[in-house]
Amino acid sequence: SELGLHLSARGNTGSLTEAWHGWGIPLSEVERWADVIRERAAAGMGEREELKRACVAAGMAPELVPRIFNGWGGLLKEMCDRGMLVYEAGTSKRFTLPPEEPVWMPRDEARAMFVRRYFEHFGPATIADCAAFLGYPSSEVAGLVRRAGLPLRRVTCDGIELFYLGDLDSEARVPGCVYLAGFDQLVLGYRNRFRFARTEDLPHITNRAGIVFPIVLYRGRACARWKLVGKRLSITEFRPLSQTARDAIAARGRRLFAGRHIVVGFQTEADLPAPKPFNLETLPSALRGSSEG
């Protein structure tokens, strides 16, 4: 199954106590509260706050609550990584037990399948692009390609060697205007984003906290961020736009949100208030330490 494939690629086959990463939770408390969470999730208490209240009612110490329910992962993440807990299908963000026991496979075999899928759907791309997207070292990706015998094809663009599987669309056409959602796969899918953005524009597309903003591509190049609040569609330019470009972007926005009677407004970065500083205290201690260093 897909669940078994994803879990196998992560390789967390051991119990919670065998491969424990901490989160500030005493080892002696891990399995006890994992059992409580699974029991409550099986009974239909799937929302994070429901599980939190249930654990407090079961006697969880106050200092454990923010650690076990850490917003960056905590015990819930560790349980999901091992197939002990999953999200329900849909957008409700409710936890439940997996419908069936995950089928485990060798980690390299699972990872090779993801490498294959990447070059089938994201190629042409570099080995480094694939590594960044999947979170594997580049040397491991190259080794998986070699050991799995993946028949990668190659093409060179601006002196960069790119790889892909299957056939390329010989009639590919760059759309005049595209609205990309936040965390869009086009942005996440590549380490080198030269395909659609200038290097100096990258800070307008992603920030140091890992947020990927909704952006507008005009004639294949990133030029602005967009935000819809109520009926107002705000376009924040980080590349100077001609009136022709603005008209095309506004028209595309009206088609995209047809029926909502939106008002489109353009502004520049200088028109925005200064961003609030990122609160490092919300990070796990390990990440906070590396950020401060």
Residue ranges of predicted features:
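Long, low-complexity intrinsically disordered regions
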Residues: 1-187, 191-193, 198-293
